[in-house]
UniProtKB/Swiss-Prot annotation:
It comes from the Archaea. PANTHER family: 60S RIBOSOMAL PROTEIN L35/50S RIBOSOMAL PROTEIN L29, LARGE RIBOSOMAL SUBUNIT PROTEIN UL29C. This is Large ribosomal subunit protein uL29. The gene is rpl29. GO terms for cellular component: cytosolic large ribosomal subunit. Keywords: Ribonucleoprotein, Ribosomal protein.
């Protein structure tokens, strides 16, 4: 997910997507523990998407604008 896509979302959409990603991360971590996870890079990508969403939400909270 690109930062521009996240910035175009409404606050509610971001929160919904954040919750979806967190749930998916939990499921993938469980799969990794059991040994059924095939794409280990997916965990890293989800963590990065979560960080991007949280960063953009914090930027808006502080009034920092990005191009």
């Amino acid at each position: 997910m690109k930062p521009d896509e996240i910035r175009k979302m409404t606050k509610e959409e971001r929160l919904r997507r954040l919750n979806e990603l967190r749930l998916e991360l939990i499921k993938l971590r469980m799969q990794a523990r059991v040994g059924t996870l095939t794409n280990t890079a997916r965990i890293r990508n989800i963590k990065r998407d979560i960080a991007r969403i949280l960063t953009i939400m914090r930027e808006e909270e502080l009034g920092i604008s990005r191009k």
